[in-house]
UniProtKB/Swiss-Prot annotation:
Compartment(s) of residence: Host cytoplasm
Organism, scientific name: Rotavirus A (strain RVA/Cow/France/RF/1975/G6P6[1]) (RV-A)
UniProt-recorded name of the protein: Non-structural protein 3
MF term (GO), any: RNA binding
Domain of life: Viruses
Length: 313
């Protein structure tokens, strides 16, 4: 027992297969012509055109409608099939079909496809022979009917037409082509020479720039070595200065608390980084000057309490 929509599904499958065949034909034709293409774009354009033609011409609805009629007949519903049979046998339907055929003929004529071409295409088919340049011409059923009705004539007369051959001065043509070739060759050589000169100039500028860069890199390396040497010398000088001050501090008759405080400040000096070491020395000198100022103020106050005067010499 067939399903109710089996014929409609087959018709839809045939339509979809026809669309896929159209896409394959379009892409294979583009490949044979050596044209690059985007498959998605070709697929979209062919689908849009195919859907429009099938829908606008009514072919899709006609096929699906006939398939639906067949499904109904297969399932025991012959009313639609009877109506279609009566419609096909109606004189009005025949007149409409005849009118459509006439419209199609006029449309073909407007496209440049005249009666001779239409008749010949309807009477003959060409079959290609694989692997050969020759082909086989096959007569259609229409051609057989015309032969049976005596509508085919054989023309045995042979008309010899003289073929007019234009005399071509190949020598002058060759000379013209040779002049054009020499002119083109000269222009190409001039452009090539100009390009070579520009390329040489660019190479010279590039080599000159490379030499300048190399010299600058050498100078930078020398300056870097000099800076490293200065930094090492400063580190050694700062370390020697700290050691000398510590030794001198130990030889002084200062209290141990003061010596310890000064030693801590000396030990906090950054011997590695000269910039930080200078800042540390500045802080140490400021502290020493501040302590000296305080001692001087204390000494000045003490002398006033003892009714003494002081002078600088």
């Amino acid at each position: 027992m067939l399903k109710m929509e089996s014929t409609q599904q087959m018709a839809s499958s045939i339509i979809n297969t026809s669309f896929e065949a159209a896409v394959v034909a379009a892409t294979s034709t583009l490949e044979l012509m050596g044209i690059q293409y985007d498959y998605n774009e070709v697929y979209t354009r062919v689908k849009s055109k195919f859907d429009y033609v099938m829908d606008d011409s009514g072919v899709k609805n006609n096929l699906l409608g006939k398939a639906a009629t067949i499904d109904q007949a297969l399932n025991g519903k012959f009313g639609s099939a009877a109506r279609n049979r009566n419609w096909m046998a109606d004189t009005r339907t025949t007149a409409r079909l005849d009118e459509d055929v006439n419209k199609l003929r006029m449309m073909l004529s407007s496209k440049g496809i005249d009666q001779k071409m239409r008749v010949l295409n309807a009477c003959f088919n060409v079959k290609r022979v694989p692997g050969k340049s020759s082909s086989i011409i096959k007569c259609t059923r229409l051609m057989r009917d015309k032969i049976e009705r005596g509508e085919v004539e054989v023309d045995d007369s042979f008309v010899e037409e003289k073929m007019e051959v234009d005399t071509i001065d190949w020598k002058s043509r060759y000379e013209q082509l040779e002049k054009r070739f020499e002119s083109l060759k000269q222009r190409v050589n001039e452009k090539y020479t100009s390009w070579v000169q520009k390329a040489k100039k660019v190479n010279e500028n590039m080599y000159s720039l490379q030499n300048v860069i190399s010299q600058q890199q050498s100078q930078i390396a020398d300056l870097q070595n000099y800076c490293n040497k200065l930094e090492v010398d400063l580190q050694n000088k700062i370390s020697s200065l700290v050691s000398s001050v510590e030794w001198y501090l130990k030889s002084m008759e200062l209290p141990d608390e003061i010596k310890t405080d000064i030693e801590q400040q000396l030990n906090s000096i950054d011997v590695i980084n000269p910039i930080n070491a200078i800042d540390d020395f500045e802080s140490l000198i400021r502290n020493i000057i501040l302590d000296y100022d305080r001692i001087f103020l204390m000494f000045k106050g003490l002398m006033r309490q003892c009714n003494y005067e002081y002078t600088y010499e």
